[in-house]
Amino acid sequence: MAHHMITLPSGAPVGFSAAGDPLSQRLVIFCLPTPGAGMFDPDPLVTNTWGVHLVSLERPGYGSTPVGTGGHLIQDRADDLAAFLAASRDAARSSGATVFGPAGIVGWGTGGMVALSLAARHPELVDRVAVFQTAAPQGFTFDPSLQALPPFAMPALGIPADDPLLERPGLRNRLERMLETAAEQGDAGTSQDRLALADRSWARELGAVQADVRLIYADDMSYVDRNDGAWYRRRIPSARVVRVSSGGALALVTEWDRILAHVAPDHGGLSEATREG
């Protein structure tokens, strides 16, 4: 379940979770995969000392966000994030708090599509994007045997159940919690994602992306690979494909410090002494 419920300016209720340092001046939005809800922190030891405020909003049908919140397109989810960012900026300005500048965005799997759509549709709100294992729109494959019905298991994320990286302290529990939260409304979230993924019109806007984009792919993954990254690279002038030699779907975890170095290079304006406590 999300840590909080918020109401967007449109009146739509959305589940909201956060991690990292709330004092940081750097906001990073994390767009989760299919299935995924709540908050997944790839490496809390890195996040907590980096100087970043990590935020995730649940898509309709996942966790605490009801079905029927806004439309069903990738663009609608991007616009939800834009509304959240704009409202957060306005609230900080009116309260005299530090006003966030443009945000960094991380997208995992299908969440990468939402991240790129946000950067295309609202370039003034986003300056850096990192997407991980995001398929090209025409290359996405939805596996009903793994992703349609809960309970969801690791293979739904492309992670073998016996992957040795799952033995990292707390990692399996954090992933299982994300999957359990994704199933709180049954298959409503994955059904909404399937509707969104059936429409590829969002990809026609990719040329409008101005943010500095990294497209990250693990060499030991077969169904989504650097060829998907090349598809995006041809459409996004500011993008670069980054290959990771190993780690599979969990390269997101092993490369988390490098990902944060891209989306939050200045450590949220916090000194090393402050970040290390």
Question: Model features per residue range: what roles?
Answer:
Residues 149-204, 214:
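Alpha/beta-hydrolase
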Residues 12-66:
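Conserved HGGG/HGGXW glycine-rich cap/lid loop of the alpha/beta-hydrolase fold
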Residues 209, 215-217:
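Short beta-strand/loop motif that positions the catalytic acidic residue
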Residues 107-111, 115:
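Gly/Ala-rich beta-loop-alpha elbow adjacent to hydrolase catalytic centers
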Residues 238-277:
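Catalytic active-site module of serine/aspartate enzymes centered on a nucleophile-bearing elbow/loop
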Residues 76-103:
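Conserved acidic catalytic loop of the alpha/beta-hydrolase fold
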Residues 222-228:
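Conserved alpha/beta-hydrolase "acid-adjacent" motif
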Residues 129-155:
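Flexible "cap/lid" loop of the alpha/beta hydrolase fold
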